[in-house]
């Protein structure tokens, strides 16, 4: 039913992506099986190969590091589903909330983590602990961290507010979604301004030993300010690395011609090929390209390529996607068999994609913001097998700060813009992970439904076209 040449080409990417849990077009399948030759104990959190007793329970290096970062940085996550997501080696990175929840439920002991965050627990004899449901809820909601931060011995200066932020998917005060969490007040910064020391820490010295986290996402300077010079430089470098030219894939179809499923599928394959090629070229132009190993770049691209492509389609190529590509899908009529066999997973992905298209049309993400979002998503230090996690985390934090600095400077009257933009990243990651599991023969119908719905709902609100985005309204909550 489907063109075999393109099916083989595209399905290879899909299958390799599915096998790694994040996506993977470049990692050899044998690479992840090296350590599976001998019988090993399994991590109690995700079932991966355990490396020892960490914070009281048998676990792998990945869950050990995740638990340590979550507790040390006092991160507060959120689950977009029913707080009961599957935890496996392939699925563990898709929901940080459920991963931390299982760490606590299995008995990982946060008191075994050194306060300075350095390697080596405070007491290696400490075993698993039993935590009440109430205490777990306090930790997951961030209330436990707030209570600790409000203790008198942890106050700082004359500013009684000790609420700070750090990169991560979370929720803020007032139950407002935000990718932030609080840090202990001995690392506090003023909420209503920006200190030179903090800027130098993040942007001026990428390899500094100790990093303070961002000012609170909702704490904005009272007076108008200029963009920090190094933020301007770093953003300029990211934008320069992008190929923002229109996609070269032909999309024009003669009037009256009916597009077949095979033809539409072949077009989607060519689009995926071109977009993937652009991501590979983008990596070579990154300002930090020489700072990381080829092995780490390979793993990062393998894990994030589908997310990068989806982000590009939602932003810099959205006008072309909702224009030329939507016109092609409009000329395709699915058969009754295709309609009846469309899966529940496909329906879920369709609804989430429609929501994201509308959300990005509401935000009108600029090229500068897109470039920062892309770099932040790419620099994912939670991916298995990376050789320089510390440096990746430092680079990630740098571009978090740069993006926040830019949005606060460019959109001073939109105080929630930065957290709204950042909260789109876990949504993209979730959808991309589900998209690679959709049967290939269902993709033409999926994209037809998504683009038809988006174009129909947005056309009545569109007042002008843009090379980056198209104006529209937000979806109803």
From Swiss-Prot:
Keywords: DNA-binding, Metal-binding, Nucleus, Receptor, Transcription, Transcription regulation, Zinc, Zinc-finger. Residues 40-115 bind DNA. SUPFAM superfamilies: Glucocorticoid receptor-like (DNA-binding domain), Nuclear receptor ligand-binding domain. InterPro entries: NHR-like_dom_sf, Nucl_hrmn_rcpt_lig-bd, Nuclear_hormone_rcpt_NR3, Nuclear_hrmn_rcpt, Znf_hrmn_rcpt, Znf_NHR/GATA. The keyword Metal-binding applies. Pfam families: Hormone_recep, zf-C4. Residues 230-461 form the NR LBD domain. PROSITE patterns: NR_LBD, NUCLEAR_REC_DBD_1, NUCLEAR_REC_DBD_2. Residues 147-187 are annotated as: Disordered. It is found in: Nucleus. Residues 156-187 have a biased composition (Polar residues). GO terms for biological process: animal organ development; anterior/posterior pattern specification; cell migration; midbrain-hindbrain boundary development; neurogenesis; regulation of transcription by RNA polymerase II; response to lipid. GO terms for molecular function: estrogen response element binding; hormone binding; nuclear receptor activity; protein homodimerization activity; sequence-specific DNA binding; zinc ion binding. A zinc finger (NR C4-type) spans 43-63, 79-98. Its main location: nucleus. Expressed in germ cells, being predominant in previtellogenic oocytes in the ovary and in spermatocytes in the testis. One of its GO terms (cellular component) is nucleus. Homodimer. Probable orphan nuclear receptor. Binds to a response element containing repeats of the motif 5'-AGGTCA-3'. Belongs to the nuclear hormone receptor family. NR6 subfamily. This is Nuclear receptor subfamily 6 group A member 1-A. It comes from Danio rerio (Zebrafish). The gene is nr6a1a.
């Amino acid at each position: 039913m489907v063109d075999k040449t393109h099916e083989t080409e595209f399905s290879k990417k899909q299958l390799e992506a599915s096998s790694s849990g994040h996506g993977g077009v470049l990692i050899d399948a044998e690479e992840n099986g090296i350590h599976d030759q001998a019988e090993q104990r399994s991590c109690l959190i995700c079932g991966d190969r355990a490396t020892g007793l960490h914070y009281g329970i048998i676990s792998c290096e990945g869950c050990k590091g995740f638990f340590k970062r979550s507790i040390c940085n006092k991160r507060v996550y959120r689950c977009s589903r029913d707080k009961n997501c599957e935890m496996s080696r392939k699925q563990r990175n898709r929901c940080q909330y459920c991963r931390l929840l299982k760490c606590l439920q299995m008995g990982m002991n946060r008191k075994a983590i050194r306060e300075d965050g350095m390697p080596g627990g405070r007491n290696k004899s400490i075993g698993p602990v039993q935590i009440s449901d109430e205490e777990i809820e306090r930790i997951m909601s961030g209330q436990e961290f707030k209570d600790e931060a409000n203790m008198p011995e942890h106050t700082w200066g004359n500013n009684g507010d000790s609420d700070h932020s750090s990169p991560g998917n979370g929720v803020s005060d007032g139950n407002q979604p935000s990718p932030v969490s609080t840090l202990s007040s001995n690392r506090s910064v003023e909420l209503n301004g920006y200190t030179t020391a903090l800027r130098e820490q993040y942007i001026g010295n990428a390899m500094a030993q100790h990093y303070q986290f961002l000012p609170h996402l909702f704490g904005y300077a009272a007076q108008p300010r200029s963009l920090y010079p190094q933020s301007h430089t770093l953003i300029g470098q990211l934008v320069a690395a992008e190929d923002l030219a229109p996609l070269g894939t032909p999309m024009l179809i003669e009037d009256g011609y009916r597009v077949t499923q095979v033809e539409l599928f072949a077009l989607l394959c060519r689009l995926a090929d071109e977009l993937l090629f652009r991501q590979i070229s983008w990596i070579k132009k990154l300002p930090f390209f020489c700072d990381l190993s080829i092995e780490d770049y390979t793993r990062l691209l393998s894990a994030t390529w589908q997310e990068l492509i989806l982000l590009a389609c939602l932003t810099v190529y959205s006008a072309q996607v909702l224009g030329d590509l939507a016109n092609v899908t409009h000329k395709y009529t699915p058969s009754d068999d295709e309609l009846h066999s469309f899966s529940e997973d496909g329906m879920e992905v369709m609804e989430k994609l429609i929501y994201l298209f509308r959300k990005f049309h509401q935000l009108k993400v600029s090229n500068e913001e897109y470039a920062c979002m892309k770099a932040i998503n790419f620099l994912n230090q939670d991916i298995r097998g990376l050789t320089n996690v510390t440096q990746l985390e430092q680079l990630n934090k740098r571009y978090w700060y740069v993006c926040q600095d830019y949005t606060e400077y460019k959109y001073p009257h939109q105080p929630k813009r930065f957290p709204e933009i950042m909260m789109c990243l876990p949504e993209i990651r979730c959808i991309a992970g589900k998209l690679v599991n959709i049967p290939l023969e269902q993709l033409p119908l999926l994209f037809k439904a998504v683009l038809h719905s988006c174009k129909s709902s947005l056309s009545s609100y569109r007042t002008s076209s843009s090379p980056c985005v198209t104006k529209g309204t937000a979806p109803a909550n």
